[in-house]
Amino acid sequence: MAQAWAFLLPVLVFGSYMTSLFFPTYISGPLCGGDGGGRSLFLCAQAPKDQDPSPAVSTMYKTAFHFQPAKNWMNDPSGPMYFNGFYHEFYQYNPNGPIFGDIVWGHSVSTDLVNWIGLEPALVRDTPSDIDGCWTGSVTILPGGKPVIIYTGGDKDQHQAQNIAFPKNRSDPYLREWIKAANNPVLRPDEPGMNSIEFRDPTTGWIGPDGLWRMAVGGELNGYSAALLYKSEDFLNWTKVDHPLYSHNGSNMWECPDFFAVLPGNNAGLDLSAAIPQGAKHALKMSVDSVDKYMIGVYDLQRDAFVPDNVVDDRRLWLRIDYGTFYASKSFFDSNKNRRIIWGWSRETDSPSDDLEKGWAGLHTIPRTIWLADDGKQLLQWPVEEIESLRTNEISHQGIELNKGDLFEIKEVDAFQADVEIGFELASIDDADPFDPSWLLDPEKHCGEAGASVPGGIGPFGLVILASDNMDEHTEVYFRVYKSEEKYMVLMCSDLRRSSLRPDLEKPAYGGFFEFDLEKERKISLRTLIDRSAVESFGGGGRVCITSRVYPAVLADVGRAHIYAFNNGSATVRVPQLSAWTMRKAQVNVEKGWSAI
């Protein structure tokens, strides 16, 4: 064990945590030829199109086991489902290059959520109602095992409406071809108070107790952001309900809404169209302000409305699906294993010029099982179990003691492609620093101000990953523990400020708080999956999840990156169990698939 904490010197952060200046701002309305969910200002900043991709750069940063096409641009997941033995992942895709535009529905299939076969696009821009783009949508499986896609299309004037498509041949196990309904669009924003350029991203449909289908669509109604509610007898003819499923005055337009049922303390998934067990809750998710937020509540069947358990006017305090580079998520009920799975889009945080040099841009996070915590207050997430099939070369350590300033190197795993699970046991909780509730408004700012180099009572402790030999490049994923009047609060941070020597990158310090009963359980868990330029971390059993994109030069030096466990807090931290694996490369859209062409 080395006393080597000197590498974490204080870092100049000049606005690195000021999200209003540091991050691209997601906006509403038509954008760069269309907008259908999860687009932002950076999409318009396109570099010259005649730049040739660099194989070396593409290989250095391209992931080994995350979902992404073989080349070109991708963004939102759209319509994931399990059908006749295959998982289907549709996604927003530009077949013509690694920049936003010409959006169609990419399509891949898998039997295990890990290895994917890339197919021809399922939907392309070829009708008046979607000539501007085949934007985000969902898949619903109708009675009799009939899948139907409902998606947002933009016309030549960029007005948005909802369209439907059916598989041409349901006996085709891959469902390669889809036929659009002759009466598209089936749903227009033609009622008073609606905004025709803020009407998109329909949810999966569900059947109510009256036998009618329901569906929510993101939109604006009389200046309110809303999940607009519609009903239908046949999934073709829709009528707007007089009131939204839920609305809010004061937030930006809600993109990519999602609505599903969950059971407290039970990771079994629920089909919203089936009978919902007693005691179940409902989650309403919306993509807004560059992040994915959600509320927990109940679905009032009499009112046909979502009622949150806690009404929070300040949207900065709304719960988050992920505290990092994660947007436009989509979930589905996996009937194969009786679980709910969620994906999100993780955009690049370098530049459009870099994307052209790489020849690709964007990826989807590892599929996650999502369920409700025992206390019913928040959602928990964990990578699907199938990803563990890529684990190899396990190393394990027990009984590590980390005093202030200690580093423990985790050797004999590929530091570029690794899965690390570690538990931190607190010998004492008496040294916890006091908690300031105002920090909840901007945990990223607090992570930036109290970085891993600033000692605390309990913490920071965690992992240093993708570290170069001399530590001039490294990323820190860590915890700090605070004591409020009645409970303990844990801050989880993913600090990218020294992740790369390159100056032209977004390098924030992401962060989120979660409550933890340290009187009952003294061990805080951390799982971090490292996949070259993508890092996903799950803290406290999935209470806080942070997706980060990093571009260190050390990725060019095979075998030269390092992983460490560390502690820089006054209180000693014990590691009862540490396990790490090298992750094998998955086959993602490269074998005999259209996307590999």
UniProtKB/Swiss-Prot annotation:
Glycosites: 169, 237, 249, 568
Positions of disulphide bridges: 447-493
Major enzyme class: hydrolase
Single GO biological process annotation from the record: carbohydrate metabolic process
Gene3D superfamilies the UniProt entry points to: Exo-inulinase, domain 1, Glycosyl hydrolase domain, family 43
Keyword Hydrolase: yes
Active site: 76
SMART domains attached to this UniProt entry: Glyco_32
Residues that span the membrane, as ranges: none
One example GO MF annotation: fructan beta-(2,1)-fructosidase activity
Activity modulation: Inhibited by sucrose.
Catalytic activity: Hydrolysis of terminal, non-reducing (2->1)-linked beta-D-fructofuranose residues in fructans
Pfam families: Glyco_hydro_32C, Glyco_hydro_32N
InterPro entries registered for this protein in UniProt: ConA-like_dom_sf, Fructan_Metab_Enzymes, Glyco_hydro_32, Glyco_hydro_32_C, Glyco_hydro_32_N, Glyco_hydro_beta-prop_sf
Annotated signal sequence range: 1-15
Keywords (A to Z) from UniProt: Disulfide bond, Glycoprotein, Glycosidase, Hydrolase, Signal
EC number(s) stated in the UniProt entry for this protein: 3.2.1.153
Family per similarity comment: Belongs to the glycosyl hydrolase 32 family.
Functional description taken from the UniProt entry: Hydrolyzes inulin-type beta-(2,1)-fructans. May play a role as a beta-(2,1)-trimmer during graminan biosynthesis.
Name of the protein described by the UniProt record: Fructan 1-exohydrolase
Species whose genome carries this gene: Triticum urartu (Red wild einkorn)
High-level lineage: Eukaryota, Viridiplantae, Streptophyta, Embryophyta, Tracheophyta
Gene for this chain: 1-FEH
